[in-house]
A protein has these predicted regions:
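Alpha-helical scaffold/interaction cores of sigma-54-like transcription cofactors
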Residues: 1-435
Length: 435
């Protein structure tokens, strides 16, 4: 979405200049790895896109991508128990002592589960079971086809990659990461149900208003923003959770920038900044900046750092980094590479004279060392949570389309929405309450 070229030829619909989307966040000369290229389509027509790519580039130049499922803690215990011939009930009793938490490991489970540790210490068979499971935990357990990934190659795919077939279709035997390391073009063709809802609603509206098109919506429509400010967002993409409704009521969004910011903030981590964001929105005279140079970068988000692109702009405008340098530091911050972060702190504050990495630094640009370090600390703490504004803008664009349809064409929108969830009884009941 940050590409002016993509916008100009109609690949994307969001004006990157109007919303200050930085192309270098996607691709720049100093970026080592290839960027992700994710494209959402109506989920009923995703296969048409894959068929088109096969025709365009040749079936032998296109393959879907393998993904490997690995043995999680509980599965490792169950699989090892099966091989050891231990009755299933006994193995299951051990496996169930592993807490059901995201990224739980056997080592950590032994630390936090008193009962699992007791079984491990007192039962030799359980000791052998878990010791063996520890050795296979995390190993590949099965292969499947990635839900969206497709690789397109200049020469026939088997020139670069080992292939297998799944349901008659070629599938790489290298995973996403390995394909990226080879420098090959990886595309994610994603099916998004909401785009199908928008299409179906548009077709229904066109039956009585042939000139209607979602490509011609007024993205400054006050009625739509009034509806959002009332929290009437059941069925609206990205904005229908109860918590998001409360934030919408508190914010009273006035434009798409507000929606972009909310989608970026309403996630674990950045969510803690929402009270400050709302307070600054309604009391702008109380917003203060550590240095005047920050004002035009952060004014669109009420004085808060919200986007990765803002981190890059701060590096560029306060310390003279190139966008490529700025993106590399942002990546180091997001991955908490402390050695790199400390080296770059010195460059941010005092500049760098190394060939190819020259920058004047904040002090040379009239910012005190103390203030420069405070700004760097603030960026470091938030960079791991900051969201890609280009992604958020895409989400906000689709969110507005669904909100506009609900506001101005509620019958057509709700019919399309209900049709899309016919296989989900709870959702049908929930959305029927809106009709």
């Amino acid at each position: 979405a940050g590409s002016i070229a993509a916008y100009s030829v109609g690949i994307t619909d969001i004006d990157p200049i109007r919303y200050n989307l930085i192309f270098e966040r996607f691709l720049n000369p100093e970026r080592v790895s290839m960027p992700d290229f994710d494209v959402d389509f109506c989920y009923e027509r995703r296969q048409e896109v894959i068929d088109y790519v096969n025709r365009k580039y040749g079936a032998d130049h296109v393959a879907q991508i393998v993904t490997f499922g690995t043995m999680a803690a509980r599965n490792a215990i169950r699989d090892v128990g099966r091989v050891m011939g231990i009755p299933y009930q006994q193995v299951d009793a051990v496996a169930k002592q592993v807490p059901m938490e995201l990224k739980m490991t056997l080592k950590r489970a032994l630390d936090v589960s008193t009962e699992l540790k007791r079984m491990y210490d007192t039962d030799p068979q359980v000791t052998e079971l878990i010791d063996t499971a520890l050795k296979v935990e995390g190993m590949p357990r099965h292969a499947s086809t990635h839900a969206a990934g497709v690789v397109i190659t200049p020469e026939p795919t088997d020139y670069y990659l080992p292939l297998a077939t799944n349901d008659g279709l070629p599938v790489t035997q290298f995973n996403m990461t390995e394909i990226e390391e080879l420098g090959l073009l990886k595309m994610d063709f994603l099916g998004l149900r909401t785009l199908t809802v928008i299409r179906d609603a548009e077709i229904a509206v066109q039956k009585h208003d042939p000139e209607f098109s979602v490509q011609k919506l007024d993205y400054d429509d006050p009625d739509t923003y009034r509806m959002l400010g009332q929290g009437d967002t059941e069925g609206v993409f990205q904005l229908e959770s109860s918590g998001m409704k409360q934030v919408l009521v508190g914010l009273q969004p006035q434009n798409l920038e507000d929606v972009i910011a909310l989608i970026s903030l309403y996630r674990p981590g950045p969510m803690d900044s929402i009270p400050t964001y709302l307070r600054n929105r309604h009391e702008p005279d109380k917003i203060s900046y550590k240095t005047p140079q920050l004002a035009h970068i952060l004014d669109v988000t009420n004085g808060c750092i919200v986007y990765q692109e803002q981190v890059m702009q701060i590096f560029r405008e306060l310390a003279g980094f190139s966008f490529g340098q700025a993106d590399n530091v942002r990546r180091a911050m997001s991955k908490k590479k402390h050695a790199v972060m400390e080296a770059e702190r010195e460059h941010f504050v005092h500049g760098c004279t190394d060939p190819g990495n020259e920058c004047p630094g904040c002090v040379a640009n009239g910012i005190s060392e103390k203030v420069a370090n405070e700004i760097y600390d603030e960026m470091s703490s938030f960079a791991s949570y900051a969201f890609n504004k280009s992604h958020a803008a895409c989400y906000a664009y689709v969110a507005f389309q669904t909100a506009y349809l609900k506001c101005h064409y509620p019958s057509e929108f709700m019919a399309a929405l209900l049709t899309s969830v016919l296989d989900n009884t709870d959702k049908v009941i929930e959305y029927s309450g809106e009709c």
